[in-house]
């Protein structure tokens, strides 16, 4: 027992000695590491080393690199020696600061901005005719490599740009020729130049800048094809003489053009749903009239195809004509078969009925039938099939002839073959219309349908370039997605247009406007970029992929040029022209570390419009959050909704205009130029340049489309035709889905672009 106790005491003593030695070793190693640290307090170091300087992304990375070796050594010693150094204040402080260096730099830069704002207060108070606000000033003194200024309607973004330029020239002593100003229109670029008449400073559009770069570096000014619309009309006319292409167009309109007629809500649902079944209303317009010459509106894409097939087979029909016998009872309304086919047999008028049933080869309805009707799938399937049975029994009872097509038949050729076989068996005379005649009937020369189709081809070819994609890229995407419709339209309908368009430009030695940007980008990349210290871009929410690549090339240099980009994602309304809102909303992902500044005071309008318009647009989670407020709590801008009876739109406009005080400016805004049709029929018109005026109640008011009104303002703004419909607002005209291969991704919010356009239209008003 005594020996065992002695051993235990010896072990305990040894452990105590080991702990003391280990603790001393920990302390000694930590002290050695601490002594070798040249910097332990990075906060003080940054403020001292960069006193009076802005630490931009490049400097921040250099600072991290210079400290990284020391940080790694500390971590390595801890790991290999199993020595915890956090008890040493110097080491603990260094590690914490290094791991939070971005925050330290941001705090330093904010203090830098505060100092500059105090130092240059008099400048910001007087550089314009009115003092710049705090948010505008803060964005101007930023010296980050990438500065994004998120503006708001009427927030003075142009004032911010002018203030930035004057600050760079007067306070940073940057030569005017080293500052590049870019806007989207010639008018805006000219206005910027006029407001800042410094020798060497000039506002450009992207296209004008690209043209000048190519001309200067190649010593040859490019010939620009400035009427591409005419080129696409010419291409269509050429291709329309090709029998194979004409056949493809007939197939396109017969079998694939359905989705162009649907609004975003419908199109966002299952595409199979749109093609198969019945909609609540008649949303599809058949290509040809019925036997009486009446336009036919049907309930599904497949019924639209049946209309085409009947016409192409030379068969007379009416859609949903009442059944020839009275069959309405307590459970059923009067029966209206989908199609009533009329023909003569031996001089005797005959009628045959055709029903389209939305069931598959197993007699099962699509799953969405149940959801739309609030039923279980079994109930929906049973009810629909009960309806089929009832219709068959009606025809059996009265001895009338019924032929049937189902959704299972709708591969185009399969449906045609079956329908033709059934009609022939029933004794219906077939007078097949030739492909050329069908083409001429589908696309009469100068018809609206022809114009819309040519516009589709032009839009696709243009967006293909602005998205910096090739036909090979699109073909790969189409192959991956694997749907028959896209393969057919891209490969058979659109690619021949793109190929011919590029052939014409090459053969005539011309370029289009997108070619200018692509060509100038290549030259800048090859020759080291532009010679600029700062590039300022207005209306940045309209940026497209080709312009983005151009900016990257322009800023290349040693050092690279700073970017100061100003725009409002709430007013991004040009996706159809190639703009990509992602480049704005995710700016830092494309350009790198970014100093984001918001200017949220609107000087144009007041409440309740400020609060209501902001709440409206921010329902879309894709939009950047802002706290918009009017410059004065006394500023008031009312929103008034006026109902009018159908047919009384002119009277409603007259009553509204008559209430507006004389001397106040008035805009009439329409979603489409089509909206001025009613005005032109009822009011005297006057044109002045590109402006259009109407005399209403003895005073002149200006008509603009909502897109054209962007950037403008009036005391009173009247939004016309705010009715749901194809040409209403929001517009339910949908783009063909194939444009999705060349357009930027939608923000995914229902009517997202239409909502932004509505915001633009609302915020033109100062009073009401």
Predicted ranges, named:
Residues 19-225, 759-763:
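P-loop NTPase Walker
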Residues 387, 392-393, 546-637:
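Conserved RecA-like helicase ATPase core segment
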Residues 661-665, 709-768:
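Conserved helicase C-terminal RecA-like lobe
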Residues 336-386, 569-570:
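Short beta-strand-loop-alpha-helix junction that forms the active-site gateway
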Residues 95-153, 202, 281-282, 289-292, ...:
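Conserved helicase NTPase motor core
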Residues 58-106, 231-284, 412-500:
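Basic/charged alpha-beta structural segments of nucleotide/phosphate-handling enzymes
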Residues 37-45, 49, 53, 178, ...:
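Conserved P-loop NTPase-based nucleic-acid remodeling module centered on helicase motor cores
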Residues 148, 154, 158-161, 282, ...:
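Helicase P-loop NTPase motor core
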């Amino acid at each position: 027992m005594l020996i065992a106790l002695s051993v235990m005491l010896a072990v305990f003593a040894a452990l105590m000695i080991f702990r003391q030695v280990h603790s001393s070793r920990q302390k000694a190693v930590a002290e050695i590491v601490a002594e070798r640290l040249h910097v332990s307090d990075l906060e003080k170091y940054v403020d001292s080393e960069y006193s009076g300087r802005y630490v931009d992304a490049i400097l921040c990375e250099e600072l991290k690199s210079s400290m990284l070796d020391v940080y790694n050594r500390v971590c390595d010693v801890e790991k290999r020696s199993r020595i915890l150094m956090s008890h040493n204040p110097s080491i603990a402080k260094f590690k914490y600061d290094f791991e939070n260096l971005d925050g330290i730099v941001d705090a330093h830069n904010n203090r830098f901005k505060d100092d500059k704002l105090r130092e240059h207060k008099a400048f910001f108070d007087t550089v314009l005719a009115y003092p710049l606000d705090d948010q505008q000033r803060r964005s101007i003194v930023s010296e980050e490599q990438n500065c994004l200024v998120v503006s708001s309607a009427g927030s003075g973004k142009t004032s911010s740009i002018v203030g930035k330029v004057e600050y760079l020239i007067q306070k940073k002593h940057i030569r005017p020729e080293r500052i590049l100003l870019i806007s989207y229109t010639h008018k805006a670029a000219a206005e910027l130049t006029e407001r800042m008449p410094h020798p060497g400073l000039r506002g450009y559009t992207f296209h004008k800048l690209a043209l000048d770069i190519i001309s200067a570096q190649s010593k040859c000014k490019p010939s620009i094809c400035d009427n591409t619309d005419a080129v696409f009309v010419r291409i269509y006319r050429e291709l329309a003489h090709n029998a194979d292409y004409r056949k493809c167009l007939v197939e396109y309109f017969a079998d694939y053009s359905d989705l162009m007629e649907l609004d975003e809500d419908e199109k966002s649902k299952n595409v199979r749903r749109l093609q198969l079944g019945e909609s609540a209303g008649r949303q599809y317009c058949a290509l040809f009239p019925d036997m009486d010459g009446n336009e036919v509106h049907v309930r599904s894409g497949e019924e639209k195809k049946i209309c085409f097939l009947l016409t192409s087979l030379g068969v007379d029909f009416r859609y949903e004509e009442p059944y020839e016998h009275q069959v309405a009872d307590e459970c059923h309304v009067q029966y209206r078969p989908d199609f009533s086919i009329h023909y003569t047999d031996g001089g005797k008028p005959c009628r045959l009925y055709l029903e389209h049933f939305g069931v598959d080869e197993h007699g099962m309805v699509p799953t969405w039938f149940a959801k739309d009707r609030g039923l279980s799938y079994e109930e929906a399937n049973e009810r629909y099939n009960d309806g089929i049975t009832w219709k068959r029994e009606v025809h059996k009872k009265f001895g009338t002839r019924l032929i049937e097509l189902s959704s299972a038949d709708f591969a185009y050729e399969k449906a045609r073959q079956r329908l033709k076989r059934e009609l022939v068996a029933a004794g219906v005379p077939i007078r097949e219309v030739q492909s050329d005649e069908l083409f001429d009937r589908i696309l009469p020369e100068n018809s609206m349908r022809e114009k819309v189709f040519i516009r589709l081809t032009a839009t696709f070819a243009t967006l293909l370039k602005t998205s910096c994609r090739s036909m090979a890229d699109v073909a790969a995407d189409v192959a991956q997605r694997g749907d028959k419709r896209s393969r057919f339209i891209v490969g058979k309908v659109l690619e021949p247009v793109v190929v011919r368009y590029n052939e014409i430009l090459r053969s005539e030695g011309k370029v289009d406007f997108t070619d200018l940007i692509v060509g100038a980008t290549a030259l800048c990349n090859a020759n080291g970029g532009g010679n600029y210290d700062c590039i300022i871009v207005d209306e940045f929410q309209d940026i497209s992929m080709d312009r983005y690549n151009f900016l990257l090339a322009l800023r290349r240099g040693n050092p690279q040029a700073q970017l100061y980009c100003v725009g409002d994602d709430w007013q991004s309304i040009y996706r159809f022209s190639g703009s990509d809102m992602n480049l704005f909303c995710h700016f830092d992902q494309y350009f790198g570390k970014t100093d984001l500044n918001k200017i949220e005071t609107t000087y144009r309008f007041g409440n309740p419009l400020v609060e209501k318009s902001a709440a409206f647009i921010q329902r879309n989670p894709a939009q950047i959050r802002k706290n918009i407020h009017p410059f004065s709590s006394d500023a008031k801008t009312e929103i008034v909704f006026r109902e009018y009876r159908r047919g009384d739109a002119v009277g409603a406009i007259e009553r509204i205009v008559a209430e507006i005080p004389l001397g106040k400016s008035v805009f009439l805004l329409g979603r489409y130029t089509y909206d001025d049709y009613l005005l032109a029929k009822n009011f005297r018109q006057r044109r002045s340049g590109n402006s259009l005026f109407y005399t209403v109640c003895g005073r002149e008011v200006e008509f603009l489309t909502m897109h054209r009104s962007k950037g403008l303002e009036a005391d009173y703004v009247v939004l016309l035709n705010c009715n749901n419909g194809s040409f209403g607002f929001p517009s339910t005209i949908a783009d063909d889905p194939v444009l999705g291969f060349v357009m930027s991704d939608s923000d995914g919010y229902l009517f997202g672009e239409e909502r932004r356009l509505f915001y633009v239209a609302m915020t033109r008003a100062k009073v009401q």
